[in-house]
Amino acid sequence: EPKTQIPFDPELAKSLLEDAGYSDENPFPKLEILFNTNEDHRKIALAIQQMWQVNLGIEIELVNQDWKVYLNREMIGDFQISRAGWIGDYEDPNTFLDLMRPNRGNNKTGWENKEYDELVEKANTINNQSERYEMLYKAEEILIDNMPIIPLYTLSLIHI
């Protein structure tokens, strides 16, 4: 399995910021998080803002937009960080991996990786499940190494 979890290590993160030249005298630039008007999304944005400020000293401005404006800003790339979500709508790794392929409506990052795209594309033509999963596994490793998105949490719902 690819390493899919990044440990919570604020001291390592601070050290990496220092290595990159950031300090009290040269603070990390203020960032904006774009999110759409929804109470749950606001709570998540507030939690991120607080955690980054407390643990890393990074100042975050929250930018709350109505749904149409939010979608438009995402589509044209008018954001630094965007709070977004995805629900796996079918039981296959491709439900998430296909999101990051270039020229797809849900890839709002602008990230492209030719090898990643070729692996996902080729995997979609293979009938042997173990061979297909091996290709998707390699694609996932590329995605994790490049990290164009930061998965922060998984929503869990219980229905009775």
Stretches found by the model and what they are:
Residues 88-92:
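A ligand-binding cleft/hinge motif common to bilobed small-molecule-binding domains
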Residues 44-46, 93-96:
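Short, solvent-exposed loop/turn and secondary-structure capping segments
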